[in-house]
């Protein structure tokens, strides 16, 4: 357990040095919310319920950083076009606006690049909150579970258009 803890500390130092905010904010146990998050798929009403419940927890961040909207992204093996989307997400890129993810269920991998081109891969799991500042080079994929539910915060969806950097990158490896 000690090795994992020290690995996460070094990961935290790496991402902090490039401006990424990475915090662990476990959700308080709430039976109704837990039941929704346990479902593989959610209809629009289910998504709206999750956004309303979890959105209350991030109001301060919305005010502090000018985020005007939020939604819930739900990826699972049955998501139409999942493989094509993951292929796009996995290419190193930046955005004109911050990218904010609050992981509620499932897990994924974010790869972050420093100015020297070194990449650090982080596994994100429920309770992880990431704020990736505009211009930080990164990429994303799902783990073998191929499931994630994440609250997304944004100021302007146009700022989320990926600007691909053309950096060659090997397959992301799951950190130990």
Curated annotation (Swiss-Prot):
Matches recorded under InterPro entries: ARD (IPR004313), ARD_bac (IPR023956), RmlC-like_jellyroll (IPR014710), RmlC_Cupin_sf (IPR011051)
Cofactor(s) essential for the protein: Fe(2+); Ni(2+)
Record's keyword terms, sorted: Amino-acid biosynthesis, Dioxygenase, Iron, Metal-binding, Methionine biosynthesis, Nickel, Oxidoreductase
Catalytic activity of the protein: 1,2-dihydroxy-5-(methylsulfanyl)pent-1-en-3-one + O2 = 3-(methylsulfanyl)propanoate + CO + formate + 2 H(+); 1,2-dihydroxy-5-(methylsulfanyl)pent-1-en-3-one + O2 = 4-methylsulfanyl-2-oxobutanoate + formate + 2 H(+)
Alphabetized CDD domains for the sequence: cupin_ARD
Record note on cofactor: Binds 1 Fe(2+) cation per monomer.
Keyword Cell cycle: no
Enzyme Commission number, as recorded: 1.13.11.54, 1.13.11.53
Swiss-Prot/TrEMBL site (Important to generate the dianion) positions: 101
Entries under SUPFAM superfamilies matching the protein: RmlC-like cupins
GO BP term (any one): L-methionine salvage from S-adenosylmethionine
Family to which this protein belongs: Belongs to the acireductone dioxygenase (ARD) family.
Task of the protein: Catalyzes 2 different reactions between oxygen and the acireductone 1,2-dihydroxy-3-keto-5-methylthiopentene (DHK-MTPene) depending upon the metal bound in the active site. Fe-containing acireductone dioxygenase (Fe-ARD) produces formate and 2-keto-4-methylthiobutyrate (KMTB), the alpha-ketoacid precursor of methionine in the methionine recycle pathway. Ni-containing acireductone dioxygenase (Ni-ARD) produces methylthiopropionate, carbon monoxide and formate, and does not lie on the methionine recycle pathway.
Protein name: Acireductone dioxygenase
Annotated organism of origin: Delftia acidovorans (strain DSM 14801 / SPH-1)
